[in-house]
Amino acid sequence: WGMHYVALNAPGIMPGNPMGYQWFDLYLNGVYISDVGPKEFEIVRSLINENVKKISNSISLISNDLNIEMSDCFVMGFSQGGIMAFELGQSLNKKLAGIAIISSRIISKEYVPNNSFLETPIFISHGAKDNVLPISNFDQSVEILKHHNYKFESHLLQNDEHTMSQETITLFQNFIKKNI
């Protein structure tokens, strides 16, 4: 394909999982992020925004070194990385080649879509047997994408848990081929 791949790790180690990384703490004051109040959500939002800037700077540096445009970049994120991928796309004033949200969700239910991002193709997938993020997160994310008229394809994978299966990889590869 003549492609370059770069994988960024989140800066924090997941509590209870020394092999896992996190962009932000899932539990603020002992409350899971889906259940936090507005004050705690603002803390999560500021952490997301801070890390989105770091990701954006990293991608800019790498794309400049490789002499490629942002419109030639696909950004994929798994779990919290999917949240970050969507938020990155939303924060840029540029169209990307594509965004992938895998076993993840769109964290904000209310926002004003960025017109450049509305033109970016989005791949979203989730495992029906995911025991980390409920399917309701996938359903809500798909509804947000539909409501704002994003260009997207969605895949609910019946045999998948909270993982990147071979089926997910194949579907994402096909998404890339369609959008390069």
Question: Where are these predicted regions, by residue range?
Answer:
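Short beta-strand immediately N-terminal to the catalytic nucleophile in serine-hydrolase-like folds
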Residues: 75-77, 102, 125
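Short beta-strand/loop motif that positions the catalytic acidic residue
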Residues: 123-126, 130
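Short, proline-enriched alpha-helix->beta-strand connector loops that line the catalytic pocket
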Residues: 70, 117-122, 148-151
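Gly/Ala-rich beta-loop-alpha elbow adjacent to hydrolase catalytic centers
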Residues: 76-81, 85
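A conserved short beta-strand
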Residues: 94-106
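Active-site signature of alpha/beta-hydrolase-fold catalytic machinery across serine-
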Residues: 87-91
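Serine-hydrolase catalytic machinery in alpha/beta-hydrolase-like enzymes
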Residues: 1-68
